[in-house]
Amino acid sequence: MPFEEPTKQDVQMSLGYGEQKHPVTGEPFFHHGIDFSVNHYLLSAVATGTVSAIGSDAEHGIYQTIRYGKYEVTYRHLSNVFANFSQSVKAGQTIAISGDLLHMEVRFDGEEINPLEFLTMLYGNIKALEHNSQMGINELDMN
């Protein structure tokens, strides 16, 4: 996961990707990411990448986008960022801290994808790296 789990308890996804009912208004809408119930968790880069955007807007507060090869991951509802625009980051490097929740969006080659697909791919790559490190191979290709 891109965040530390300080209590070693499972982190709950509070809102999934796709067609949803707004948690406050009850109105149907398309949710372009996933939300996690986290409170000021440290966020880490999931691979070597570059900060491609940082900003703030009224709806999502502070946000940061990291480009990992053909993947672009945007984290919203942040309380602070530690990696600056155009800065290179390495896997495991602390890049930001979440606010009361974390909203995550993912694009592959410019096309929006379900962030759970990205996280599932990451988990598979981590398992492969663990296996490969036993064989002396230490590369992760995000392209």
Task: Kindly label every feature range from the protein language model.
Residues M1-I62, K90-A91, A128, S133-N143:
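Surface-exposed, glycine-biased beta-strand/turn segments
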Residues M13, I62-R67, F85-M142:
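Conserved, short, structured surface segments that act as functional micro-motifs
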Residues G16-G18, N39, G69, L78, ...:
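Generic beta-structure capping elements
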Residues F29, A45-F82, D100-V106:
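Zn2+-dependent peptidoglycan hydrolase active-site motif and core
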Residues H40, S79-S86:
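Gly/Ser-rich catalytic serine loop of serine hydrolases
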